[in-house]
From Swiss-Prot:
Family, as annotated: Belongs to the purine/pyrimidine phosphoribosyltransferase family.
Species assigned in the record: Rhizobium johnstonii (strain DSM 114642 / LMG 32736 / 3841)
Subunit architecture: Homodimer.
Presence of the UniProt keyword Nucleotide-binding in the record: no
SS bonds (residue pairs): none
Broad class of enzyme this protein falls into: transferase
Reactions that this protein is recorded to catalyse: AMP + diphosphate = 5-phospho-alpha-D-ribose 1-diphosphate + adenine
Gene expressing this chain: apt
Protein name: Adenine phosphoribosyltransferase
Example of a GO cellular component annotation carried by this entry: cytoplasm
Source species taxonomy: Bacteria, Pseudomonadati, Pseudomonadota, Alphaproteobacteria, Hyphomicrobiales
PANTHER family listed in its UniProt record: ADENINE PHOSPHORIBOSYLTRANSFERASE (PTHR32315:SF3)
Length: 180
């Protein structure tokens, strides 16, 4: 692990038994509160796409908004929020997606992305991949080209990265933590 990645990993707080026993919650608010770590994380998320024309960054609610906005700014791209059902005021497109314990829905404004636009998904963490797979399908449903997905944290034991890659999405992550 290089120094930057080690620093990023050290800036993420681990909270055992949250939100339930046996889960270790990876809290990036400590990374976001550290100006140096936040800057480095955004720089590392942007790096694979430097020099590439990316039309939009799609951030998933809620921490994906923070990171996605910063990535969009650095890449001079537009930003698109992907939200939980019922949170957007204009005409939307919606998709149901699977979670570890059920089904949920997400949506985005119908006119936020045009067919053929190149989009990168951004979120803080990929675990089972349900949200990221749902967002990929939602974007493709309106004709976007999902050219990549980037996350600060990967929990590889839960298989989310593999699910996205099976959909042909190139995945870029910064820090891996084992377990749940």
């Amino acid at each position: 692990m290089n120094n930057t990645i080690s620093e990023l990993a050290a800036s993420i707080r681990s909270i055992p038994d949250y939100p339930k026993p046996g889960i270790i919650f990876r809290d990036i608010t400590t990374l976001l509160g550290n100006p140096r770590a936040f800057r480095r994380a955004v720089d590392e998320l942007v790096q694979p796409y430097a020099g590439t024309k990316i039309d939009k960054i799609a951030g998933m609610e809620a921490r994906g908004f923070i990171l996605g906005g910063a990535v969009a700014h650095q890449l001079s791209s537009g930003f698109v929020p992907i939200r939980k059902k019922g949170k957007l005021p204009h005409e939307t497109v919606r998709i149901a997606y699977s979670l570890e314990y059920g089904v949920d829905e997400m949506e985005m404004h119908r006119d936020a992305v045009q067919p053929g636009e190149k989009v990168i998904l951004v979120d803080d963490l990929i675990a089972t991949g349900g949200t990221a797979v749902g967002a990929t399908r939602l974007l493709r449903q309106i004709g976007a080209e999902v050219v990549g997905a980037c996350f600060v944290i990967d929990l590889p034991d839960l298989g989310g990265r593999r699910k996205l890659e099976e959909l042909g999405v190139v995945v870029h992550t910064l820090v891996e933590f084992s377990g749940h």
